[in-house]
Protein backbone atom coordinates (compact mmCIF):
# COMPACT_ATOMS: atom_id res chain seq x y z
CA UNK A 1 0.00 0.00 0.00
CA UNK A 2 2.83 2.39 0.89
CA UNK A 3 4.55 1.70 -2.41
CA UNK A 4 1.37 2.56 -4.32
CA UNK A 5 0.96 5.80 -2.34
CA UNK A 6 4.64 6.57 -2.93
CA UNK A 7 4.23 5.95 -6.65
CA UNK A 8 1.13 8.17 -6.78
CA UNK A 9 3.01 10.88 -4.87
CA UNK A 10 5.97 10.63 -7.28
CA UNK A 11 3.71 10.82 -10.32
CA UNK A 12 1.84 13.78 -8.82
CA UNK A 13 5.12 15.60 -8.09
CA UNK A 14 6.40 14.89 -11.61
CA UNK A 15 3.19 16.19 -13.17
CA UNK A 16 3.31 19.26 -10.93
CA UNK A 17 6.92 19.95 -11.93
CA UNK A 18 6.09 19.47 -15.61
CA UNK A 19 3.18 21.91 -15.31
CA UNK A 20 5.43 24.42 -13.53
CA UNK A 21 8.02 24.08 -16.30
CA UNK A 22 5.33 24.72 -18.92
CA UNK A 23 4.11 27.76 -16.99
CA UNK A 24 7.69 29.06 -16.74
CA UNK A 25 8.15 28.56 -20.50
CA UNK A 26 4.95 30.47 -21.20
CA UNK A 27 6.04 33.30 -18.91
CA UNK A 28 9.43 33.47 -20.61
CA UNK A 29 7.72 33.54 -23.99
CA UNK A 30 5.57 36.46 -22.89
CA UNK A 31 8.59 38.27 -21.49
CA UNK A 32 10.43 37.70 -24.76
CA UNK A 33 7.49 39.10 -26.73
CA UNK A 34 7.34 42.12 -24.44
CA UNK A 35 11.08 42.63 -24.79
CA UNK A 36 10.82 42.46 -28.58
CA UNK A 37 7.96 44.97 -28.52
CA UNK A 38 10.04 47.24 -26.30
CA UNK A 39 12.99 47.00 -28.68
CA UNK A 40 10.70 47.84 -31.58
CA UNK A 41 9.31 50.86 -29.75
CA UNK A 42 12.82 51.98 -28.77
CA UNK A 43 13.95 51.67 -32.37
CA UNK A 44 10.91 53.64 -33.56
CA UNK A 45 11.56 56.36 -30.97
CA UNK A 46 15.19 56.54 -32.04
CA UNK A 47 14.20 56.83 -35.70
CA UNK A 48 11.82 59.66 -34.77
CA UNK A 49 14.63 61.42 -32.91
CA UNK A 50 16.95 61.02 -35.89
CA UNK A 51 14.27 62.44 -38.20
CA UNK A 52 13.69 65.42 -35.91
CA UNK A 53 17.42 65.98 -35.60
CA UNK A 54 17.81 65.88 -39.38
CA UNK A 55 14.93 68.33 -39.89
CA UNK A 56 16.40 70.79 -37.39
CA UNK A 57 19.85 70.40 -38.90
CA UNK A 58 18.59 70.93 -42.44
CA UNK A 59 16.68 74.03 -41.35
CA UNK A 60 19.85 75.44 -39.82
CA UNK A 61 21.82 74.59 -42.95
CA UNK A 62 19.27 75.69 -45.54
CA UNK A 63 18.82 79.11 -43.93
CA UNK A 64 22.36 80.36 -44.71
CA UNK A 65 22.38 78.63 -48.10
CA UNK A 66 19.12 80.34 -49.03
CA UNK A 67 20.56 83.66 -47.84
CA UNK A 68 23.58 83.22 -50.11
CA UNK A 69 21.37 82.34 -53.07
CA UNK A 70 19.19 85.39 -52.46
CA UNK A 71 22.26 87.61 -52.10
CA UNK A 72 23.72 86.30 -55.36
CA UNK A 73 20.35 86.73 -57.11
CA UNK A 74 20.26 90.33 -55.87
CA UNK A 75 23.67 90.93 -57.42
CA UNK A 76 25.86 90.81 -54.33
CA UNK A 77 29.21 89.11 -54.58
CA UNK A 78 29.45 86.17 -52.18
CA UNK A 79 32.69 84.42 -51.32
CA UNK A 80 32.30 80.81 -52.56
CA UNK A 81 34.82 79.60 -49.97
CA UNK A 82 33.02 81.07 -47.01
CA UNK A 83 31.28 79.02 -44.36
CA UNK A 84 28.04 79.34 -46.31
CA UNK A 85 29.38 77.26 -49.19
CA UNK A 86 26.84 74.60 -50.28
CA UNK A 87 29.40 71.77 -50.40
CA UNK A 88 30.68 72.61 -46.94
CA UNK A 89 27.21 72.35 -45.46
CA UNK A 90 26.35 69.19 -47.38
CA UNK A 91 29.56 67.55 -46.17
CA UNK A 92 28.93 68.61 -42.59
CA UNK A 93 25.31 67.49 -42.73
CA UNK A 94 26.26 64.07 -44.08
CA UNK A 95 29.05 63.63 -41.54
CA UNK A 96 26.76 64.49 -38.64
CA UNK A 97 23.99 62.24 -39.95
CA UNK A 98 26.35 59.28 -40.27
CA UNK A 99 27.90 59.75 -36.85
CA UNK A 100 24.47 60.16 -35.23
CA UNK A 101 23.10 57.03 -36.91
CA UNK A 102 26.22 55.00 -36.06
CA UNK A 103 26.08 56.16 -32.46
CA UNK A 104 22.60 54.72 -31.95
CA UNK A 105 22.79 51.68 -34.22
CA UNK A 106 21.16 48.65 -32.68
Swiss-Prot record:
The free-text function statement in the UniProt record for this protein reads: Minor structural protein that forms a portal-like structure at a unique three-fold axis of symmetry, following binding to the host receptor. The virion attaches to feline junctional adhesion molecule A (F11R). Once attached, the virion is endocytosed. Acidification of the endosome induces conformational change of capsid protein thereby injecting virus genomic RNA into host cytoplasm. The channel formed by VP2 may allow the delivery of the viral genome through the host endosomal membrane.
Alphabetized Pfam families for the sequence: Vesi_VP2 (PF05332)
Organism expressing this protein natively:
Feline calicivirus (strain F9) (FCV)
Which Gene Ontology cellular component terms are annotated? host cell cytoplasm; viral capsid, decoration
Give compartment(s).
Answer: Virion; Host cytoplasm
Q: Cite any additional comment in the entry.
A: Translated by a ribosomal termination-reinitiation process from the bicistronic mRNA coding for VP1 and VP2.
* Record's subunit section: Homooligomer. The portal-like structure consists in 12 copies of VP2. Interacts with capsid protein VP1.
Q: Which family does it belong to?
A: Belongs to the vesivirus VP2 protein family.
Keyword annotations for this protein, in alphabetical order, are: Capsid decoration protein, Capsid protein, Host cytoplasm, Virion
Q: Which domain of life is it from?
A: Viruses
Annotated protein name in UniProt: Minor capsid protein VP2
Q: What is known of its domains?
A: The N-terminus domain points away from the virion surface.
Amino acid sequence: MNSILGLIDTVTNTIGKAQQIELDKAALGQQRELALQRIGLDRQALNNQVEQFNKILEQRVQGPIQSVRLARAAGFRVDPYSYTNQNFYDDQLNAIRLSYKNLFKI
